[in-house]
Amino acid sequence: MRAIYDYIIYTDGGCERNPGGRGGYGAVIINNSTGELTDISGGFRSTTNNRMEVMAVIKALEKIEKGTHIQLFSDSQYVIKTMNGMFRKKKNIDLWKKLDKLAVAFEIEWNWVKGHNGNTYNEKCDTLCQEAMTLPELEEDVGYMNTDSVPEQSDTVAQSLEKYNMYPDCSDVESYQEKYLVNPI
């Protein structure tokens, strides 16, 4: 008998000093057919907690066979609310583009889980994330740009979003939720 979901994924990301500190991400992938668990983790020297939350989802999806049905849990309202169309994709556009490109290859049910609340897999992801950010040799997060060092721009935020086509394709929240199988928070 086929399982309802091919995979169940839990993700977490964090940063020791946000923004600009050492960050890490962690994910646990559960193969629902075999029960096999796969842990994924990594980190960066200079990043943000939100970038690591999105990165955790990307890295997990990159390990999964396309066309499968996934139940995904994240303790990041930033991730879940952005994927269900409640937040606009204003920052971390490089990661959102990657995630959007990956997400369309799957049937994903997006779920929020309360962090640090005793959920075994969420706690495991948090541990993976914390361990990853302490690794001695971390890469620079090339997509991260510390906004404190960016010179003033003449464009308004709206002009910049328009210019760089940064508006997500989620203006119709209901169709976006249906497309990505999002459970409203």
Predicted regions and their residues:
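RNase H-like nuclease fold core
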Residues: 1-51, 62-64, 68, 126, ...
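RNase H catalytic domain
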Residues: 5-8, 14-19, 55-148
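Charged/polar, low-hydrophobicity segments characteristic of intrinsically disordered regions
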Residues: 87, 162-165
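N-terminal cationic amphipathic segment used for targeting or macromolecule association
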Residues: 113, 154-156, 171, 185
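Intrinsically disordered, low-complexity regulatory segments in eukaryotic proteins
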Residues: 152, 156-163
